[in-house]
Amino acid sequence: MGTDPLIIRNNGSFWEVDDFTRLGRTQLLSYYLPLAIIASIGIFALCRSGLSRYVRSAECDLVNEYLFGAQEERKEDNSIERLLRNSNTQANYVNVKKQGRILKLRHFDITTIDVKQIDAKNHGGLTFSRPSTSDHLRKSSEIVLMSLQIIGLSFLRVTKINIELTNRDVTTLLLFWLILLSLSILRVYKRSTNLWAICFTAHTTIWISTWIPIRSVYIGNIDDVPSQIFYIFEFVITSTLQPIKLTSPIKDNSSIIYVRDDHTSPSREHISSILSCITWSWITNFIWEAQKNTIKLKDIWGLSMEDYSIFILKGFTRRNKHINNLTLALFESFKTYLLIGMLWVLVNSIVNLLPTILMKRFLEIVDNPNRSSSCMNLAWLYIIGMFICRLTLAICNSQGQFVSDKICLRIRAILIGEIYAKGLRRRLFTSPKTSSDSDSISANLGTIINLISIDSFKVSELANYLYVTVQAVIMIIVVVGLLFNFLGVSAFAGISIILVMFPLNFLLANLLGKFQKQTLKCTDQRISKLNECLQNIRIVKYFAWERNIINEIKSIRQKELRSLLKKSLVWSVTSFLWFVTPTLVTGVTFAICTFVQHEDLNAPLAFTTLSLFTLLKTPLDQLSNMLSFINQSKVSLKRISDFLRMDDTEKYNQLTISPDKNKIEFKNATLTWNENDSDMNAFKLCGLNIKFQIGKLNLILGSTGSGKSALLLGLLGELNLISGSIIVPSLEPKHDLIPDCEGLTNSFAYCSQSAWLLNDTVKNNIIFDNFYNEDRYNKVIDACGLKRDLEILPAGDLTEIGEKGITLSGGQKQRISLARAVYSSAKHVLLDDCLSAVDSHTAVWIYENCITGPLMKNRTCILVTHNVSLTLRNAHFAIVLENGKVKNQGTITELQSKGLFKEKYVQLSSRDSINEKNANRLKAPRKNDSQKIEPVTENINFDANFVNDGQLIEEEEKSNGAISPDVYKWYLKFFGGFKALTALFALYITAQILFISQSWWIRHWVNDTNVRINAPGFAMDTLPLKGMTDSSKNKHNAFYYLTVYFLIGIIQAMLGGFKTMMTFLSGMRASRKIFNNLLDLVLHAQIRFFDVTPVGRIMNRFSKDIEGVDQELIPYLEVTIFCLIQCASIIFLITVITPRFLTVAVIVFVLYFFVGKWYLTASRELKRLDSITKSPIFQHFSETLVGVCTIRAFGDERRFILENMNKIDQNNRAFFYLSVTVKWFSFRVDMIGAFIVLASGSFILLNIANIDSGLAGISLTYAILFTDGALWLVRLYSTFEMNMNSVERLKEYSSIEQENYLGHDEGRILLLNEPSWPKDGEIEIENLSLRYAPNLPPVIRNVSFKVDPQSKIGIVGRTGAGKSTIITALFRLLEPITGCIKIDGQDISKIDLVTLRRSITIIPQDPILFAGTIKSNVDPYDEYDEKKIFKALSQVNLISSHEFEEVLNSEERFNSTHNKFLNLHTEIAEGGLNLSQGERQLLFIARSLLREPKIILLDEATSSIDYDSDHLIQGIIRSEFNKSTILTIAHRLRSVIDYDRIIVMDAGEVKEYDRPSELLKDERGIFYSMCRDSGGLELLKQIAKQSSKMMK
């Protein structure tokens, strides 16, 4: 064995010319390297105990979270419970603030949720992945091969064969392999990621080192045969071992896998090998399945345990409890991931520059005519080095981006989860915004949805922006350093240009951020307005406001587009700077070199410099764009932060828990809607001292606007407590409550006046996630009078009721809401006027069998009602309110003794037949009878599937396969047609030709060997620079070359900016036309479209999809065209230089085609699923915000938070695997690109005699560009196609069935010459039949009746009889199957819809108000003067006659604070939430009175108003509309008993039609029985008789 150092060639050096020396191979590779690895293993072993504890703790964090749930939080809860039970604190009702804080945490804090048991359902479970037979075989092979290596080294050590290694080297290697074998054996018995990582890292390092002596053997630098045999043997062993290592699972033994209980296939991410992780092969099976079958949501694999939103939010909340700044909290949560990402960025940036350095060395060899064989060896080494660098770059780039995507996914989950939780816990009623707050966030529904749909996604993408930004900064620094190394002082010229560009780019980025903020503000306004319109689409259609609203939204849209135009201008300037900067930097640098330093350029230096400046171009562009994106994200982050900083509900602070948990009372309590209301005369509940009777029926009575609903909200903690106290029995979360022996819990249930329902089945709305008890459920159905309704519904209680219960009548919605409250286990039930929406039959049944029936035994019921005559019986306690104060209270007997109730209201008529004529025992109609009778405001449109399985809401359409050419043609039509596209292509091609011309011009310059340096005026010593040679005579002046170079670059930059502007202008034109077209189509769609399409889904089109077309589609279209033309030109250029490359290009094209096809197929479907799974998030959020008061009343916040997280996870699954598919594709494209560089360099070397260094530089430079260009072409086209998915989704709405606004073509009547139509108001219905869908049976059958001009007609009947459907037909929301409706003799089907609807006025059952002011709601389009508005308000008793006189006598705007309705600019909250329902209804009636219609329709318009106000309104109708025809649907028979005629409907048919007095003569008639069951038969007879006499 050789030991003599004298025989070592070039003693003391590790490298000579083209290879490692013997010293390098022996000492560096065979001694120092193994020794360093052994030392590292030893150091790790010494620190093992501490490290293993840390690693094990980190690894088991989530496992412990699953196994032990929220035990720590329970400990804190238990401490509070002990505090509550402490007698010392009972006297003071506990520390309210601390109690409130803890209670709020228990309701809303995600950390309090036990993951193992969520609402009696597991979230998921842990399982183990066991090693397979192949895994065991790999381990055995690994041990055998290492043993062979040890045997070989031992043989060398014993036999002392003479090789170039010393005994010391062999001994070190032997020790290294023995340690590695010991660790491998230990891994068999002990599961440890650390041991696997040590073995893999050590072996990979040694394996790489064995390539060096093998190369020495190959090029003949190792002469002795024994050494050759040893190195070959070592290389074979390590090379055989390496695939085993690469394909072994990262964790040797069993791996923990988290499996969801929804049967989702678990993620393969953590059970894959290192090779699979590096190459992303673990997703290949999924991508392959996507080629065979269309991907559905159920086919997408699950996430890793740590990527499920519940674990993300738990960790985020726990780590950041004491951090109030959202930005700092996010940074604190992801600082480790950010650090890892930055490390990948650093390695990526360095490796990215190595090919350019190697290319310079390669070109120097090509440029040297006296090349030796050693130089050729180096040239091949450089080409192989470039190939390896490209492969390494592929790994680094994909892994770094993957870390960013992980952060993006988790930030998205955090932001949506936090915004949702904030929406649940925010204060409902806040002070109005002042003018100074105009720029702050307005937390209406549309804005909050915008925060989720746009802002949260922009902020989540910040991780990717930061990754690219840091990469760009590092690249710029390193490139500048290399330029200085190659060019010397002249590099500072280029650096100066860059430094000048930085402030410009930063300024432009700030401008983009500013315009983005303006754009988002306009987008908020547009989405809010549109959302409000869609939520109330029926009101819009009734009043024919479509065109007005379209104009309003278009006006906002125009402002939005102006902001986008400003952004486009800035983008164009940015594009110009991007193209011109490399030219300026390169040209100025070359000018300094030639004119100042008096040196000539050669090909290696010129093309290396050019390549470096090309590399510099990308990070400069990225830096500018990323700064812009970061600014946009900053704006979005601030908007989210502002929303999250809004006030939380004070419910848990201002409600006091009774020590004995058995009290509900107000103690000297004063409450307001707004905490800091500056109006001292604003409505308040003042000085309340009420003690409700526990376990009894308590009534809250009073006139409209007296504060009845407000009192219930105050009891629920939703109003602001100014003084006093409110005592309640409990505030525990629903799922922490323990039932008593009767199955009841000490909690509240709430039924609001406007029924709030989920878009779900009837059954699920009633069960409301309580334990299902079939017997109790059936009793509740019966008690609430729903039995017959469920028999009629197509799928019974499994029928989907649609968004906001769209398929149900008002009475059905109210009864389902009541059933939910009664079915709950709550001991205390709050009912807000739940009897007003049902007919007299049903009201009696509900009161006797539900409210006072056995289901309410031992339960407290607090009932707000106007139906005094019905509810006084069996009630125990009553409170009478007047103007926010308690007028009277006491037991019913006490109040009657005071003469409070008039005898006619409390006298109850006999109900002997009630058991025979109850709400549920009426015979259900035949199957061919009416399936569902709708109220006017709530129409149903069934389809065949709905009839069969009860499903109403159609699943969102998802196209399969590639985007249809029709979609591209549709978009191109708006874009400007083929002419615009051809013109743009011409601009792009011209710009690319100019770009290539610059490289050819440089080659022409450097090949001119006689360039003179003619720079008089410069007197600077020449600096010695590598690669530069002096020359005294030139063919052309250097100034000539520089001038042409600058000229080409500037023209190219101007074209670049111009083409960007033209592309954006064309895109904005398309975006504007698409939006206008979509808006017109949606608002003029048939009502059936809104019944089967959730508003959240429509809003997703108008928010996310429009935003995609506005701001994402065009930039991707621009760069896709750019890359396409770039790749085509590069292939042509390289083929001209090296024709052999054409063969490689064909092979590469085939590879790209198949890889791209696989990628596009999978990514396209995943992108579509990503888009589709966003809609349920928005829809669920919209539903939650509307019903937040009910959710909080039930204490059911946790379940809704968890449901939101489930929907986030659905979306994140699609997003995550889309991002992984992108990594799979980009790695393979980068790998193919690496082979392109290798092939290009090889062709140059094989044809080196015929290629000069200039052509070689162009060929190699563009080969590298082709790699990046091809990668970005497919990726950008894929992203462009994914964004075209938004266009596809928008195009789907282009085929929405439209209402026939101009009437039927045949015999159309526009009535343009009759502006006063109708003159008389005569209505004639002949043989009318109606149905909701073509494939459904009629709901109205052969109805005929005639209404004389100026007559008053009442329409009565049981809930669901078809009353409101008749009204709907008058507005042509339903078109007749047979028959017709005539008004003044004109068939309304032939009349223009706008004319028809503006000629009829409706006052619907649900009072709908829009966010704004009193004036904007009463007179939205400034058609009337203020005095007329005040007159209408006076007519409905919202202002008194005295106040109206004051208004008439006042010449200035009247702003009295004594009555809010005297100030027409009083703010109205969205939905009118700051008014009582009665006040909302009166305001709506005032709106209708202004129109002075000839025909007025009232659909339960006074159901939510007290009897006195009802009587007043009826009087107004009779006096003010004495020349109008009136049709009134009423459950209060008193309201219509004095009408001219009564229509009695049942099962879609007219059963009775006559004068009320005549109908009451028939004791067997339906009307008679209804009057008898109402409790005032004699009184009704008397009124009808008097009315009949007056008419005679």
Swiss-Prot record:
One GO MF term: ATP binding
Induction, as annotated: Under the control of the iron homeostasis regulating AFT1 and AFT2 transcription factors. Up-regulated upon SUB2 overexpression.
Membrane topology: Multi-pass membrane protein
Source organism superkingdom: Eukaryota
A single Gene Ontology CC term: fungal-type vacuole membrane
Sorted UniProt keywords: ATP-binding, Glycoprotein, Membrane, Nucleotide-binding, Repeat, Transmembrane, Transmembrane helix, Transport, Vacuole
Main location: membrane
UniProt-annotated binding residues for ATP 1: G702, S703, T704, G705, S706, G707, K708, S709
Positions of transmembrane segments: 34-54, 75-95, 101-121, 132-152, 171-191, 330-350, 380-400, 466-486, 490-510, 573-593, 615-635, 990-1010, 1052-1072, 1116-1136, 1138-1158, 1230-1250, 1253-1273
UniProt-annotated glycosylation sites, renumbered to this chain: N11, N370
Binding-site list for ATP 2: G1357, R1358, T1359, G1360, A1361, G1362, K1363, S1364
The UniProt record lists the keyword Transcription: no
Spans within the Vacuolar topological domain: 1-33, 96-100, 153-170, 351-379, 487-489, 594-614, 1011-1051, 1137, 1251-1252
Residue ranges, Cytoplasmic side: 55-74, 122-131, 192-329, 401-465, 511-572, 636-989, 1073-1115, 1159-1229, 1274-1592
Domain ABC transmembrane type-1, residue spans: 338-632, 981-1282
CDD domains: ABC_6TM_VMR1_D1_like, ABC_6TM_VMR1_D2_like, ABCC_MRP_domain1, ABCC_NFT1
Domain ABC transporter: 664-908, 1323-1572
UniProt subcellular location: Vacuole membrane
One GO BP: transmembrane transport
Subunit and interaction comment: ABC transporter which may be involved in multidrug resistance.
PANTHER family named in the record: ABC TRANSPORTER ATP-BINDING PROTEIN_PERMEASE VMR1-RELATED (PTHR24223:SF353), ATP-BINDING CASSETTE SUB-FAMILY C (PTHR24223)
Similarity annotation: Belongs to the ABC transporter superfamily.
Protein name (database record): ABC transporter ATP-binding protein/permease VMR1
Organism the protein comes from: Saccharomyces cerevisiae (strain ATCC 204508 / S288c)
